[in-house]
């Protein structure tokens, strides 16, 4: 089936892939390519329109230039943040450093235009947006008009109606920009005229064919954690190659309470996949002893996983591939985007935590999907809701939820505290009868390797502290902390302190992403 397509040129923003997610939400197929994609390849791709992403650099840096021939293709172009500056700079306008960096919420005053007509927030002709820029356009190119401004950014939006070129100095792809989807839909559906035809069933068909082509008759090992990503990856790969897939469930001593039994029962009942259960707690704990640096912990856990998989591979006659449930937020936070320009934040177990001498080839069928797309894919593959809508769990498990050195004692305490938190979230509902577990996107406890003084009965205690973390997000690239009811937090705190011997204080994390990441390590 021939589909209308949008091309996104990536200049290295941490949130570039959210643009692709928003376009896909409109059921329009899109691909994200490096900013230096050759013009002949762009022509061959034959997009209905082009979106230029944001990025951390200046238009005056020669290493970050796209082929300006894109402005001669006769198709609409939308520049976002750096993309707007690139457009202005190369079409005869001027870009200069701002007097102050603008980061966070801003209100843009708009005028009626092809891009903004009928789109506004609470006040007439205003948009509540998310800014993140230093440089700004100071002079318009010929043929352009200002269609939006802020007090510190007089040219916050611009357009050339004749050529259908548009520039916006904010990020419509992040959820903080309330009308961001509406603006992107206006560009993609109305201005570009793209017809919606991209659906998850179509994606499954293409992904299954690609997996079969990649793998051939080889056998595949998948590291099964029981989380959403590895579960959906297993279902998709099993759909493609059946019994060529063997799942390896590694109990590294850093799992949630009773997780081993739950995972084995769930997959035996729901997927019919071959699953090997490996008890490797002693091996992992020995390697992690004395290690406090989070990056080193991730690398060690990744390396030990490979050791386990290598051992299992020797038992299979034709194993050539290691499958993982890597999704795009894992990749972007490790600066693993195709441009290699995004600023690195931390390595991920599924990306930068793997050793270079790995003996198996990597199969990552979910690598370009966002979390909500992965869930949608899981439902389309026939997985039960209890599996698909389970909160994410990191590959290194509790190893990155125990700050500092990992010890069995700490893991046992954290497991109990985390289970109490999740129980109470499941058992508490809002006024509409929806559980707080379903209302939050991810929730967990974090073990802090510090002790605090407390009083229980008539005695003094000196025990450990746990932090509770709950966030709400649609894409895991940005997130708000969940405003849980005080009564719920109080019950969780009371239960943990009374039921988990060794913990006497509970705190709640009220940090958003950005500036914090969702996990503490």
Curated annotation (Swiss-Prot):
Q: Which GO terms describe its cellular component?
A: cytosol
GO molecular function of the protein, one example? GMP synthase activity
* InterPro entries referenced in this protein's UniProt entry, alphabetically: Class_I_gatase-like, GATASE, GMP_synth_C, GMP_synth_GATase, GMP_synthase, GMPS_ATP_PPase_dom, NAD/GMP_synthase, Rossmann-like_a/b/a_fold
Pathway(s) where this gene product acts: Purine metabolism; GMP biosynthesis; GMP from XMP (L-Gln route): step 1/1
Q: Does the keyword Ligase apply?
A: yes
Instruction: Please list the reactions this protein catalyses.
Output: XMP + L-glutamine + ATP + H2O = GMP + L-glutamate + AMP + diphosphate + 2 H(+)
User: What residues bind ATP, as annotated?
Assistant: 225-231
Q: Identify which residues the record assigns to the active site.
A: 81, 171, 173
The answer, when asked if Chloroplast is one of the entry's keywords, is no
Q: What is its EC number?
A: 6.3.5.2
Specify the GMPS ATP-PPase domain's residue ranges: 198-390
Enzyme type, top EC level: ligase
Keywords attached to this entry: ATP-binding, Glutamine amidotransferase, GMP biosynthesis, Ligase, Nucleotide-binding, Purine biosynthesis
Q: Provide the Glutamine amidotransferase type-1 domain boundaries.
A: 5-197
Briefly, what is this protein's role? Catalyzes the synthesis of GMP from XMP.
Q: How does it assemble?
A: Homodimer.
- Protein name as annotated: GMP synthase [glutamine-hydrolyzing]
Q: Which gene encodes it?
A: guaA
């Amino acid at each position: 089936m021939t589909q209308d397509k949008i091309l996104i040129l990536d200049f290295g923003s941490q949130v570039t892939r959210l643009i692709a997610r928003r376009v896909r939400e409109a059921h329009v197929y899109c691909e994200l390519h490096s900013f230096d994609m050759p013009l002949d390849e762009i022509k061959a791709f034959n997009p209905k329109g082009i979106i230029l992403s944001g990025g951390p650099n200046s238009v005056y840096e020669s290493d970050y230039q796209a082929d300006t021939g894109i402005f001669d293709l006769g198709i609409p172009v939308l520049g976002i943040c750096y993309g707007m500056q690139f457009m202005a700079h190369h079409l005869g306008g001027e870009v200069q450093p701002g007097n102050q960096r603008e980061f966070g919420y801003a209100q843009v005053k708009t005028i009626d235009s092809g891009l903004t007509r009928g789109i506004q927030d609470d006040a007439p002709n205003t948009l509540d947006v998310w800014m993140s820029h230093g440089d700004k356009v100071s002079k318009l190119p010929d043929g352009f008009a200002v269609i939006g401004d802020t007090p510190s950014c007089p040219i916050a939006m611009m357009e050339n109606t004749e050529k259908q070129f548009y520039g916006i100095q904010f990020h419509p792809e992040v959820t903080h920009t309330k009308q961001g989807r509406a603006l992107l839909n206006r560009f993609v559906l109305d201005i570009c005229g793209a017809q919606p035809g991209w659906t998850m069933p179509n994606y499954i068909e293409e992904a299954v064919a690609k997996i079969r082509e990649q793998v051939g008759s080889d056998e595949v090992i998948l590291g099964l954690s029981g989380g959403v990503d590895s579960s959906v990856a297993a279902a998709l790969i099993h759909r493609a190659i059946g019994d060529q897939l063997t799942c390896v469930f590694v109990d590294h001593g850093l799992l949630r309470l009773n997780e081993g039994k739950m995972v084995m029962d769930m997959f035996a009942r729901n997927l019919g996949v071959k699953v090997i259960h490996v008890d490797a707690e002693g091996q992992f704990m020995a390697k992690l002893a004395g290690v406090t640096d989070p990056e080193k912990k991730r690398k060690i856990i990744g390396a030990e996983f490979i050791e386990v998989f290598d051992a299992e591979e020797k038992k299979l006659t034709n194993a050539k591939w290691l499958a993982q449930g890597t999704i795009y937020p894992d990749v972007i936070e490790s600066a693993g985007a195709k441009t290699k320009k995004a600023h690195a934040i931390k390595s991920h177990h599924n990306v930068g935590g793997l050793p270079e001498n790995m003996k198996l080839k990597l199969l990552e069928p979910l690598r370009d999907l966002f979390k909500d797309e992965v869930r949608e894919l899981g439902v389309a593959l026939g997985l039960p809701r209890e599996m698909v809508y389970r909160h994410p769990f990191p590959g290194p498990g509790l190893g990155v939820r125990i700050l500092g050195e990992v010890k069995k004692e700490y893991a046992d305490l954290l497991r109990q505290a985390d289970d109490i938190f999740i129980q109470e979230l499941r058992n508490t509902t809002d006024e509409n009868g929806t559980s707080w577990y379903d209302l939050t996107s991810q929730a967990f406890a974090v073990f802090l390797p510090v002790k605090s003084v407390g009083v229980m009965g008539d005695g003094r205690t000196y025990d450990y502290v746990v932090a509770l973390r709950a966030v709400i997000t649609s894409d895991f690239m940005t997130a708000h902390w969940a405003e849980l009811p005080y009564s719920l937090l109080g019950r969780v705190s009371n239960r943990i302190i009374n039921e988990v011997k060794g913990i006497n204080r509970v705190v709640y994390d009220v940090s958003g992403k950005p500036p914090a990441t969702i996990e503490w390590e």
